From Swiss-Prot:
Protein name per Swiss-Prot or TrEMBL: Ribonuclease PH
UniProtKB keywords: Nucleotidyltransferase, RNA-binding, rRNA processing, Transferase, tRNA processing, tRNA-binding
Keyword Transferase among record annotations: yes
Catalysed reactions, as listed in the record: tRNA(n+1) + phosphate = tRNA(n) + a ribonucleoside 5'-diphosphate
Family, per entry: Belongs to the RNase PH family.
The UniProt record lists the keyword tRNA processing: yes
Record-annotated disulphide pairs: none
Subunit annotation: Homohexameric ring arranged as a trimer of dimers.
Positions contributing to phosphate binding: R86, G124, T125, R126
Natural source organism: Bradyrhizobium sp. (strain ORS 278)
GO biological process terms held by the UniProt record: rRNA catabolic process; rRNA processing; tRNA processing
Length: 237
């Protein structure tokens, strides 16, 4: 039995609310159960120096957690003077994932910066961030289209992410913190709207897992991502 009493293939309640920040070109408040992330997408007429003059744009991301997003207060990284390795890893993952969804040449020589701020953390902050970031990015693209800044289709596919793991010997979908902290195996799957794989991160925390168990996790992930993509489409409709 899962601590949440969910079925093995049951996700937490998920919501994606688009357009929640009036100043940002794109935004989304994403909730995976008790994990809440505010995502904004900012259009900028600048590029990394190495990309200038190449006729294409760029998508980059930043990720952070509010001090009381967790049970005990976490010191702000800005006050510590450096980002943790975990933060750097997650924001690079978000940026990589979103770039697969975009025709960077159609975007033109512009940069979209996606900021993911975790308001409350209960497991799966990176997967929630990626899923909500796609909605914020789509919201930003819509803003650009409304102002005739782009003429062709920029978004190529949906991108969503979900966690899976082996908990008490059973493959389960969308781990919350209680499950993640006790799981024998946990993995994050980032996929496109048609089920292609962008990235897989998987770790045996206690016992090595078999190929059959990995395939069971992937099957759960495909089901979860399919559900998330449906919710994304509803959010941007």
């Amino acid at each position: 039995m899962r601590p949440s009493r969910r079925a093995p293939d049951e996700m937490r309640a998920v919501s994606l609310e688009r357009g929640v920040v009036k100043y940002a070109e794109g935004s989304c408040l994403v909730k995976f159960g008790d994990t809440h992330v505010l995502v904004t997408a900012t259009l900028e007429d600048r590029l990394p120096p190495w990309l200038k003059g190449q006729g294409r744009g760029w998508i980059t991301a930043e990720y952070g957690m509010l001090p009381r997003a967790t049970l005990e207060r976490t010191r702000r990284e800005a006050s510590a003077g450096k980002q943790t390795g975990r933060t750097v890893e997650i924001q690079r993952l978000i940026g990589r994932s979103l770039r697969t969804a975009i025709d960077l040449e159609a975007l033109g020589e512009r940069q979209i910066t996606v900021d993911c701020d975790v308001l409350q953390a209960d497991g799966g902050t990176r997967t929630a961030s990626i899923t909500g970031a796609w909605v914020a990015l789509a919201d930003c693209i819509r803003w650009m289209k409304a102002r005739n800044m782009i003429k062709t289709e920029v978004l190529r596919t949906n991108v969503a992410a979900v966690s899976c793991g082996i908990y008490n010997g059973t493959p389960v979908l969308d781990l919350d913190y209680a499950e993640d902290s006790e799981a024998e195996t946990d993995a994050n799957f980032v996929m496109t709207g048609d089920g292609r794989i962008i990235e897989v991160q998987g770790t045996a925390e206690k016992t090595p897992f078999s190929e059959a168990e990995f395939l069971a996790l992937m099957a759960l992930a495909r089901k979860g991502v399919g559900r998330l993509v449906d919710l994304q489409k509803m959010a941007v409709a």
